[in-house]
């Protein structure tokens, strides 16, 4: 009897899981998988975040160096960087705007969705979409640029969340719903962004 009940619930679980996967959905393959584990959830007290990039995005990566910048320097914000073929490919990239640059930026791993900096601040990303009516077409930022700027400027998760929120409030967010996981050496957070 126990094996019949286990099989029944396993079958129900499998059917309900498959019902959520619809290859005909235009957003199928756009929702990455993110993983988070805080200190209390790991054997050695580590903090972990990871994500799979399940979309059709660039595969190259590059370690960007730490840098110092002049007081008058600006940071150029781009749209379209997810689909570049090399670090210098600007064919489908457009300038969205500029923001003031900070005096010093950290080294970070530049991937389709920038993922970690020299201070062990790490990020993962998952698209969860949402209705088109919630997309701010005039918003300057896409999620990958917000991640890039936070990794350049922040050494902990809370500061990254504050910075990203402030940039969205000031310049706008111009994409569908996103969930980013943000981890440092001590804690991990999940931040959801939609329609700003």
Write out the residue ranges for each language-model feature:
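A contiguous strand-loop segment
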Residues: 21-142, 163-196
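Aromatic- and Gly/Pro-rich donor/ligand-binding loops
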Residues: 160
């Amino acid at each position: 009897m126990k094996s019949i009940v286990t099989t029944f619930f396993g079958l129900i679980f499998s059917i309900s899981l498959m019902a959520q996967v619809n290859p005909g959905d235009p957003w199928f393959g756009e929702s990455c998988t993110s993983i988070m584990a805080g200190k209390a959830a790991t054997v050695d007290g580590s903090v972990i975040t990871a994500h799979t990039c399940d979309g059709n995005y660039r595969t190259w990566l590059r370690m960007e160096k730490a840098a110092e910048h002049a007081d008058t320097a600006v940071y150029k914000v781009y749209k379209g960087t997810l689909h570049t073929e090399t670090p210098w490919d600007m064919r489908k990239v457009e300038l969205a705007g500029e923001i003031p640059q900070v005096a010093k930026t950290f080294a970070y791993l530049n991937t389709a969705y920038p993922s970690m900096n020299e201070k062990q601040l790490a990020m993962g990303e998952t698209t969860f979409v949402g209705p088109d009516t919630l997309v701010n077409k005039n918003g300057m930022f896409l999620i990958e640029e917000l991640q890039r700027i936070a990794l350049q400027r922040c050494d902990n998760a809370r500061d990254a969340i504050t910075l990203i929120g402030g940039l969205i409030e000031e310049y706008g967010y111009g994409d569908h719903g996103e969930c980013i996981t943000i981890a440092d050496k001590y804690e991990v957070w999940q931040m959801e962004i939609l329609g700003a």
